[in-house]
């Protein structure tokens, strides 16, 4: 869609991509059946889009740093990532969004700090789809940024939300068990 709308070229990276099952005849779009890595740094991008992938990566700092090293000195390259918003999961007791294949979870603050640590200047973070997802837009930083730790109030809030989530999930399970006993 991005390639079509802007008359652009696009390259997708997916280690599970099978061309025979996913035929594409879209002009300017091609797929690489591999994990993205620095060996693809010669793929010059104006825009790097990574949606609903980062939460599946255990070493997120290494991956985001790889993206940063790959775009090197191209200061005008914009990166856009989208991940589930853990704050919403905790706040709204959205336990159905805690998947076994998700090994990394983010709040707006933790996502921002990750990108700053990896050499990006964060342009903005937003929530999308009624707060279900976090998005971050960034570009390569022109200078080394200071590492900003989480504030104590943010840590306290997340701790309280996590404890509340645990308690409320237990209560929800008990309520469902009682409901099922009635059948």
Please place each PLM-identified region on the residue numbering.
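Hydrophobic adenine-recognition pocket in adenosine-nucleotide-binding enzymes
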Residues: 53
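A conserved beta-strand element that flanks and buttresses the S-adenosyl-L-methionine
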Residues: 46-49
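Conserved SAM-binding strand-loop segment of SAM-dependent methyltransferases
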Residues: 22-41
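Flexible, glycine-/basic-rich loop-and-beta segments that form/coincide
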Residues: 123, 131-175, 179
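Short, glycine-/aromatic-enriched active-site segment of Class I SAM-dependent methyltransferases
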Residues: 79-104, 108-112
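Conserved SAM-binding loop of SAM-dependent methyltransferases across substrates and taxa
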Residues: 1-7
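A short glycine-rich, Lys/Arg-flanked "PGG" loop and its adjoining helix->strand segment in the class I
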Residues: 61-80
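Conserved SAM-binding motif I beta-strand of class I
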Residues: 8-14
């Amino acid at each position: 869609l991005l390639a079509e709308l802007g008359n652009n070229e696009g390259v997708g990276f997916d280690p599970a991509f099978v061309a025979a099952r996913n035929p594409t005849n879209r002009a300017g779009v091609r797929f690489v059946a591999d994990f993205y890595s620095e060996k693809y740094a010669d793929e010059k991008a104006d825009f790097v889009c990574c949606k609903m992938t980062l939460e599946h990566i255990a070493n997120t700092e290494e991956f985001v740093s790889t993206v940063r090293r790959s775009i090197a000195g191209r200061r005008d390259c914009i990166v856009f990532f989208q991940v589930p918003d853990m704050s919403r999961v905790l706040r709204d007791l959205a336990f159905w969004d805690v998947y076994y294949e998700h090994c990394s979870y983010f709040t707006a603050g933790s996502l921002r700090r990750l990108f700053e640590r990896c050499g990006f200047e964060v342009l903005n973070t937003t929530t999308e789809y009624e707060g279900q997802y976090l998005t971050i837009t960034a570009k390569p930083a022109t200078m080394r940024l200071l590492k900003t730790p989480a504030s104590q109030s943010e840590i306290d809030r997340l701790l309280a939300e996590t404890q509340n989530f645990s308690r409320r999930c237990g209560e929800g399970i008990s309520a469902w068990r009682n409901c099922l006993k009635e059948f």
